[in-house]
Amino acid sequence: MTNYLLTNNKQPITNNPSRVALVIQYLGTHFYGWQRQPQHRSVQEEIEKVLSTVEHQPVTLHGAGRTDTGVHAAAQVAHFNATSSIPAHRWAAVLNSRLPEDILIRASALVAPDWHARFSASWRRYRYTIYTDACPNLFVRPLSWHYYHAPLDESLIQEALTPLIGKHHLAAFHRANSGRSHSWVDVQAAECYRNGSFIHIEIQANGFLYGMVRLLVGILVQVGRGELQPKHFTELWVNQRREEVKYAAPAKGLCLLRVGYPDSPFPPDAWFDTQPKFLLPQLMG
């Protein structure tokens, strides 16, 4: 039996490359985002280095989305073309044996040659976590925004979020110089709920503008503490008043929760538990 974890020896090369998809988790604390960039550590580059070592040739990894510096992922999706004879379902184990501890491959699967992690996706879902207890928690700190300065009313935040559902021009929550040609977003779900000392804001859309969720949360906190009425929040983005959106919530509270596909190539257990406790077991109840 071939031991595919022993990748120091060159694997047999196949004539026809196969396309392999991955479900990836990472803690974004020590990364300058997903995308490869000179002189900075990125998730894409860390995985590509291992893939290239195993494949004995340069390998490019294509992600479903580009998370920013400090943003986490519970289920990023990416694909690459493999020429070695390693079965697609074994790539998760092969990679996990070599990757640093802040990256984990949840699953790997064979996909069609024209399948694309980004362009085949129909939606992405992000969650932002706010920790509201006045007492600091070391284990919670890397994964949430510790906000205890004033009480937050999650029902007011939900009232503000509901009108966002639908296709809208959200230029008010779009950072400048992003390179995107338009700011239309089809928001499929937007919800805010409390779990003990944690407030979670989840948004699902066909795509996201650069910095969109963090800018949204930054002003939704004003709604939650009663400084901005929900209807004024709606007027702000309807009238594209970008100059009034001045603060982005810290990156560490944001997590790419899941990427949706019409026909998912992954088994159900590839997706991590999407309940609020999935990132902080025993700490969020």
Give the predicted meaning of each segment.
Residues 11-12:
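Cationic, low-complexity basic patches in intrinsically disordered or flexible, solvent-exposed regions
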